[in-house]
Amino acid sequence: MSEQHAAAQDVWERYEDEEWRQDQSHWRGVGRWKDDKRWQAIGKHTLSKLRATWRLLDRPHFPEPFVALEWGPGGGTNLFAMQRLCRTYYGVDISPSNLAECERMITQEGHSNLFTPVLLTAQPSDILAIVKEPIDVFISTAVFQHFPSKEYGIEVLRAIKAVSKPGTLGVVQIRYDNGNEKFRSITDLSEYRERHITANSYQIDEFWKILRDTGFSPLMIRDINAQVNYATFIFHCT
């Protein structure tokens, strides 16, 4: 296990306040997510972005059922939103607890064979041993900001490229770096535990270039939120 992976797992699986960890991981019925409409809204918004992008690309129809992969599914709000649209939904996480919660939640919804958990044990390329079919959709919301380094995020994109095919659509939310000290990336792994909420950020043009360098074609940037420095990148595999 790499030092970066161990530092992240120490927070996202073994944090001393489990209720807080579940809230930050978007578990249904916990903390802020006791409001179920608010919890479901996250997944609905992600799905609306996918549908809008499909129209932007002038593709004839939304591919149903499709194969999706989410990096950092947490408590499964995106999984919940897409449960009737997918034939396979891969959830990649460093937290066994989060993956177990996704399985519990989606089984309770009557789709026990839909979700395939992918537990990372060392590095992002771990997924290549489990994801054996090309994916149609890649999703990652409010996760890249928690990565222990910019380079880790690049490795994630390389792993995703390896399981993509021409036409694979990606939706990734990042925290962008505009010089605000609050959102600067950490420079040493020793900072991670204290600053895991704002550990990683990219300049807008930097992340656009990273997508191109890892084999994707960026399409647009949307949902820029200047209060928390969020930006969502839409891209596809050519």
Regions found by a protein language model. Give the residues of each.
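Class I (Rossmann-like) S-adenosyl-L-methionine-dependent methyltransferase catalytic domain
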Residues: 1-85, 92-129, 150-152, 169-238
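Local beta-strand N-terminus motif with an aromatic residue
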Residues: 65, 135-136
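Residue-level marker of regulatory loop/turn positions in helix-turn-helix DNA-binding domains and
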Residues: 132
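A conserved beta-strand element that flanks and buttresses the S-adenosyl-L-methionine
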Residues: 139
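Short catalytic micro-motifs in class I SAM-dependent methyltransferases
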Residues: 142-146
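A short, conserved alpha-helix within the catalytic core of class I
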Residues: 147-159
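Conserved helix-to-beta-strand junction in the class I
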Residues: 159-165
